[in-house]
Amino acid sequence: MATLSQLVDNLVATTFELDGPRVRIGRHPENDVQIDEISVSSRHAFIDVEPNAYLEGTTDYFISDNNSTNGTFVNDIRLTERQRLNNNDVVRIGWNIFRFVDEDENTLEKTAFILEE
């Protein structure tokens, strides 16, 4: 299972498990990942957890901004549409920095495969 780890001075402060199907992120207490900080919108972003279409037993994670005031960024690029998260991506929600970690993807990087048409 993948995680989203909040970083403070490049050290992990808090880790959240992404056990979907949809993980809601924001300031409101009803979110799965609650960030009580002024730069975060009440319903800031969400991560969809979906089975991979090609590799049975693997999972993909897609992040979307939910029309937040200060935006959602992946690797310093502001999201304008849904984006797939990759292992070690850096996610910024308001002024808060997170690292996306997917240990299963890390294992798959060592495996080559050919898709049949």
Language-model-detected regions and their locations in the chain:
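Short, mixed charged/polar active-site loops
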Residues: 12-15
